[in-house]
Amino acid sequence: MRGKQLLYGFCAAHGVGHRRTGKWIVAQTRAQREALERIERLCSGELGVPVRWVGDGEVRRAGEGVRAEEGALESPTTGIVDAHGLMVALQGLFEDAGGVVALNSPVTAITPLGGGGGGGGGCDASSSSSPSPKGSAGWELAVRDAATGETSTITAETIINAAGLGAADVHNMIVPPERRTRLHYAKGNYFSYAAPLPRVSRLIYPAPEPGAGGLGTHLTLDLGGRMRFGPDVEWVESPEDLAVNGARMADAVAEIQKYLPGVDASCLAPDYAGIRPKLSPGGAVGTGKGFNDFIIRMEDGYAGWVNLLGIESPGLTSSLAIGEEVERLLYGSVTPS
């Protein structure tokens, strides 16, 4: 909620394209309706998220061809954003503040300076009886220029591991072997839609299925009103496996037609794919067990290091609020925006 609030304000202030579309989460069975009722109780109670019930009759009267036999839960404040425009705006503010964006510059080694408090990593233990945490004297990073192969060294007071799909690799450069981790990669295939009808004006999500590993193949919109469907969940070994798997389109069509029966399957085409970094393997997610939320924390035994692991959807919506939390962890307070 905090992320959504900040994002709407930021986009309005900095001219980033966005639109409040609203969202329906649709139920076709009584079991799905009961699942949405649990979500509604959580939203209306503990979370304070505005939602309302939309009956099947209201769904049909909207005239957009959406099917919701057991009704829909509406989130009226959900919206869409120009993700690239958002990144460009943030980059501009970062550079205006003196920051440098160094693309194609992989980090190859990280050494915490000072301390010897048992965190592991690349420096010798202190002889002090009460050693300070590793990183208490800063950090040293080796960075390779992908174009020339040359390696340079950067020192910093703090580091924030926000490397996304590469965040586990960065984490593992610092910690001892017994504290290493890995990410599990869920590719999401998206499919574009070229037909003029049906034309839907809001986001449509199927009711969540326990252990599905994602939110289902939903209907999303771009700022021009064009519809896309996705993402599905395809477990892959490499975070670079971004080829759209057209063989999965038949399964996607079957899922889409449950809530949009009038969709013309011949007008769907493979569009693009993205990778979600999961903290739990496919088997754990598939059984509904072993779920892990985002990791945003200072690591025990280290100073000046904030770790961000498993930041997938809704990481974009949460991004500005995550920034606030990182600032609070490092400095104890948040600078007013």
Q: What kind of feature is each model-predicted range?
A:
Residues 123-126, 288-337:
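C-terminal lid/capping helical subdomain adjacent to the catalytic/cofactor pocket in oxidative enzymes
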Residues 4-7, 33-39, 56, 87, ...:
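A general structural signal for well-ordered alpha-helical segments in protein cores
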Residues 16-18, 152-301:
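Active-site substrate-recognition segment that forms the wall
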